[in-house]
């Protein structure tokens, strides 16, 4: 759509104004995103568009900014996930299987995969019994990465967390 508009404009001043306005709009859109996965897809699409017309080259820089911001968001999630895992394993212990999953997928993705495989597993209830719900994979996914799981799974997590009697923590998730 953008390329079609750009090709229709014969005046280069109007075309460059369109590109500048589009760059500004995209930069505003980028920093409103909190989902690194969607942001990377957006960056890919922006880059593809930037290669289709000579006047659209400034969009490549915007795509690079989007990619950098997505990486920054991912690293923030990994730092939080690492702390959740550290505190949770101090309380509950760590299995070899989970360590292997951490090495293979990274901290945040390991927590998401744990929740995808089983919501409310025995480790969840062990941490609940020790009043450490904030260190569960379910709590992490519900609070920080709801975009990484399906809506059905997210509803299941919210139902599970609503059965726990720790209202101050549950307000953080909702």
Question: Language-model segments: what does each one mean?
Answer:
Residues 62-63, 67-73, 91, 117-119, ...:
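Amphipathic alpha-helical binding modules
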Residues 84-130:
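Amphipathic alpha-helical packing elements
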Residues 12-19, 27-41, 50-59, 89-90:
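Charged, low-complexity interaction regions
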Residues 36-39, 52-65, 69-88:
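Contiguous, amphipathic alpha-helical segments that mediate oligomerization or scaffolding
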Residues 24-25, 49, 117-122:
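A short structural micro-motif
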Residues 1-27, 71-91:
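Short terminal alpha-helical segments
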Residues 41-48, 97-100, 110-116, 138-143:
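Short, hydrophobic/amphipathic alpha-helical patches that form generic packing surfaces
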